[in-house]
Amino acid sequence: MDTTSSVDFLGADGKWQREMGTAVAEMAAVQRAAESIAGRVAGMVRGLPDMNLPIPNSEWTVGEAAAHLAFATLGMAMMARGLEIPYGDGTREGLAMANAVALEGFTERDGAVLADRLEAAARMVFDEARAQPPDRMCPTPMGTMPVETLASYLVTHLSMHGSAIATAVGAPWPFDADDLPLMWLFIAYVMPRVPDVAQIAGLNACFELQFGDVLDCALMVDGGAVSAALAPARPPDCVIAGDAQLLFLVIVKVLTMQGAIAAGDVTLSGPTPDLGLRLPDLFNVP
């Protein structure tokens, strides 16, 4: 696949950009992806007889994860409108506490009801986004971001939690490999904001990530700070390559790096390949 047509117009400033430099809102492709993913997740839970199934490597059940997706997606619709919704402090710990409080208050666990609410909320995000001025900035738990980045956040969030549900119910991943470029705006926005300070202390390294043939990007760790770009700023110390879907799920900790490597789905190379084993632990992905 030619990654130029998929990625080169994604600006690191949180805006979609054409090669001619004109900023445009490429929301149609993002909307199709988000609504498709939401529909697939809804299909996993709509007729599920036991919503109390535990999710592997998670404290949540399927019902709790589906409830989280339903109310969080509705929250994103309100954020797209420009409303500020206090919800944690952007840290993994703060968001975990906010999620726990929200799940106590939002008690719906019926799969059919949650499926309908999730699909409706995903549509609502884009209804709100279309009604906003092009320079709309949206307050979110991860900071204030352009509405285009919020839409990318939605695709990422649905893919991450939807895939966790898929591991519990034995369903296919709800997102496609071609959805990865649509997540780039949020990935570039959030990764510099969520490093584990203790883990990156004293580390200077450049990681090149190759998500199949759909997205190449890089994460640079220098002096306690992280930057993200579509190309490495210097020769990479470690190249992490693999199946686009599985590598994404490793980064967001739905799957483990060790398991993906053992299965042959991810490979590490470069001058310091073992650095790749540390990559997921360098970030507190919320």
Language-model region placement:
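Helix-loop segments that flank and shape redox-cofactor active sites
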Residues: 40-61, 82-87, 128-146
